Amino acid sequence: MGTYSNDQSRILKIVEDIFGSNQINSTMKKMFICLMALCTLTVTAVSAQKMDQTAKNLKFYGHVWDVVVNEGRVDMLDTAFAENVVLHTTPLVTGKANAKAYFANYVTGFSNRQFIVRESLAQGNKVVKYWNFKGKHTGTFFGIPATNKDVDVIGCTIATIVNGKITEERDFMDMLEFLQQLGIMPR
């Protein structure tokens, strides 16, 4: 260790002899400023990259549910869902095939479907959407025969998106209100 300090001192002495101590201080300051600028640019670039991915996740997620619900194309979930997707519902739904079957109930159970995202936000790999679902119950919905009643419910979903795939969803809505609108539960 002592040798290292001695060598370091000798190198500094040689550089001072060549350039003068004022030049070293000036050069060190310039190097420090350049290093700080480089660090700042790197942090800014990484932050911009993360913000760009967050914006992509938000756009992707909105597009998926517009296509699935409004256009009735449940096949979109083949590319949008991760193979091991988890839907935190009652009961818990796991796997892409089961998740597709779950959402197919909404497409086959309701005509005149409208899925409107009222507000959405994202941070990192999480997307949150506040939504409104409207439709007429004209088909079988999770075993419930058509009631020909209109529904208009609001809810919120928290989703996780990893590598461009939806890996997890948690939906929250007033199920009592939904069942009352279907005429299944009394008001």
PLM regions: where:
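Bacterial Sec-dependent N-terminal signal peptides
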Residues: 1-51
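A solvent-exposed, acidic/Ser-Thr-rich amphipathic alpha-helical stretch
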Residues: 52-59, 74-127
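Short, solvent-exposed coil/turn segments at beta-strand boundaries
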Residues: 77, 124, 159-166
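A mature extracytoplasmic/lumenal domain signature
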Residues: 91, 121, 133-135, 173
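Exposed beta-sheet edge and beta->alpha loop/turn motif
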Residues: 135-163
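Low-complexity, intrinsically disordered terminal/linker segments enriched in charged
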Residues: 167-187
